[in-house]
Amino acid sequence: MVRRTKEEAQETRAQIIEAAERAFYKRGVARTTLADIAELAGVTRGAIYWHFNNKAELVQALLDSLHETHDHLARASESEDEVDPLGCMRKLLLQVFNELVLDARTRRINEILHHKCEFTDDMCEIRQQRQSAVLDCHKGITLALANAVRRGQLPGELDAERAAVAMFAYVDGLIRRWLLLPDSVDLLGDVEKWVDTGLDMLRLSPALRK
């Protein structure tokens, strides 16, 4: 009985997340209410509050779902024991771009995060959440780059902090550009070239050296 109740709770949580995704994609995060999500999910607002305190937590759940399929590659590149951290980063980026193009749900969630998540005054929690997510990502990239330097895969004088900012900006900008104008960039056909462009920047740019 306890197991069944737990499974039902997990199913309800998944329903709510799916409904939030649909509502956010259609109306934007700021214009969507928890009542809208409850109606789409076929649950009460109380059921939503059982699982999520606010919209910020629902946005975080969508963000977390993007990381599930490639989290192991991120962790590997950040580990000092990984012998090929730059290779792990390359695989991760290939996976990120391929999923963006080929998986409809991944594309919708990215649309929400990049183009439908307005930072209005009453959305300060979501702004803070996104700031925290960017800083966490920066920390992970910096660790991966430092590991690649130690393994001789990147120049010894690479400024890992500055390079991490540049790499995030490159990837984030390419995703935003493709979402806005998908026909202007062959992200799938040229995926290896796009990834290697970013990695070549790390290897070759004098401006990223200390």
Swiss-Prot record:
Inducing stimuli: Induced 4- to 8-fold in the presence of toluene; this is controlled by TtgX, a possible efflux pump global regulator. Induced by chloramphenicol and probably by tetracycline.
Known DNA-binding region: 33-52
One GO term of the cellular component aspect?
protein-DNA complex
Keyword annotations for this protein, in alphabetical order, are: DNA-binding, Repressor, Transcription, Transcription regulation
A GO molecular function for this record? DNA-binding transcription repressor activity
InterPro entries linked? DNA-bd_HTH_TetR-type_CS, Homeodomain-like_sf, HTH-type_TetR-like_transc_reg, HTH_TetR, Tet_transcr_reg_TetR-rel_C_sf, Tscrpt_reg_MAATS_C
What region holds the HTH tetR-type domain? 10-70
What is this protein for, i.e. what is its function?
A: Represses expression from the ttgABC operon promoter and its own expression. Binds to a promoter region between the divergently transcribed ttgR and ttgABC genes/operons; in the presence of chloramphenicol or tetracycline this binding no longer occurs and ttgR and ttgABC are derepressed. This suggests that TtgR binds these antibiotics.
* Complexes and interactors: Homodimer.
Quote the protein name from its UniProt record.
HTH-type transcriptional regulator TtgR
Q: Which organism is it from?
A: Pseudomonas putida (strain DOT-T1E)
Give the gene that encodes this protein.
ttgR
